Amino acid sequence: METNQILETIRMIEEEKLDIRTITMGISLLDCMDGDGEVARKKIYQKIVTKARNLVAVGEAIESEFGIPIINKRISVTPIAIIAGSSADTDYVEFAKTLDAAAKEVGVNFIGGYSALVQKGYTKGDEILIRSIPQALAQTERVCSSVNVGSTRTGINMDAVRQMGEVIKETADLTADTQGLGCAKLVVFANAVEDNPFMAGAFHGVGEADCVINVGVSGPGVVKRAIEKVKGEPFDIVAETVKQTAFKITRMGQLVGQVASEKLGVPFGIVDLSLAPTPAIGDSVAHILEEMGLEMVGTHGTTAALALLNDAVKKGGVMACGHVGGLSGAFIPVSEDAGMIEAVQQGALNLEKLEAMTAICSVGLDMIAVPGDTTAETLAAMIADEAAIGVINNKTTAVRVIPASGTKVGDMVEFGGLLGTAPVMPVNGKSSASFIARGGRIPAPIHSFKN
């Protein structure tokens, strides 16, 4: 390796905030099912603690050995609605507490998989789990929850969409003392993926191995610095520059994943190619788009800039890694991106533009704070719009929205840490209640019939 490449890597880490955002261990709990809920919970705790006992230590050892910051060590598990559904329990909050206790025992930041897959309908376990989400998130610290309400193959379950509007509202009320923090740990998906390493939407799919390591990379600052060097050049050059930069970022993710896999004795799953921002200055996806020539993110041209970025990152990343997966799209969480926060405050970025950007990235309405008096029906309608984009375009889309109790447009909601600060954004004042009240299913699109 040439000296200038070594120096470039050091600069990327030290100055441009290149890091591994997460090493996530996916653990199957299918062998923990039991008719007795208490027995099932003991099995779950035992399996998680056994499998993930060395996860944090190995992550820290890799950090020291390679000098690469690894921000989060996390766990994802089989959707609990499936596991708990075999028990006679009528409330699953105790399962959430078990996950929380296991996460604390092994020292991980978050554990995902308090989840239900209801894109076509409910099982008994799904119904109980979804009802219990607000209490589960209010009574735990590290548990993340997700619900898949639609897919290209099945259409959109509008009964589930309506219920998730109510669940988000109740979760915000129950966690009002932390400005609705529970909602930051709850994602509603269409076309959810089984190998996502990022929270809050991670769960371990039933088609996955017993235990795997998935890696999520992050490098918005590196990409921005690279684009600075091609100022005024045509888009062909910009795309090629992003592609080459993404290759380098993903190579590092591949290395970390393989080393972690060997040290833990667990198969290596995938690298997720998503560019994940943080609230830190110089770690913003919005600033990448602005570097391409936009005065501020949200103006006309933003969606096109995001499309170029997203596609070039994927092309570079696929070349660098044998197995890519997860969401693999740019993340645009408002509260976690300094450039996004500024654009909202300046009036350049609104919910409608973020919805348009969803057509390009994975989680379009992500970490959005809306007024506390936003109705459950309006929240459900926002979910329905996002799900429709995903279902029609055959891609993952999601919503993570926080109707923080007692807030109004222009207020700031403070979450701290990686979750950042969210300006409260206005929602459309006209009602969608009669639309949401219809229920039923929106049928799958005509192009879903592939066989």
Curated annotation (Swiss-Prot):
InterPro entries attached to this UniProt entry: UPF0210 (IPR007841)
Signal peptide: none
Gene3D superfamilies: 3.20.70.20
Oligomeric form and interacting partners: Homodimer.
Family from the record: Belongs to the UPF0210 family.
NCBIfam families per the UniProt record, alphabetical: PRK05313.1
Protein name listed in UniProt: UPF0210 protein lin0538
Organism this protein belongs to: Listeria innocua serovar 6a (strain ATCC BAA-680 / CLIP 11262)
Organismal lineage: Bacteria, Bacillati, Bacillota, Bacilli, Bacillales
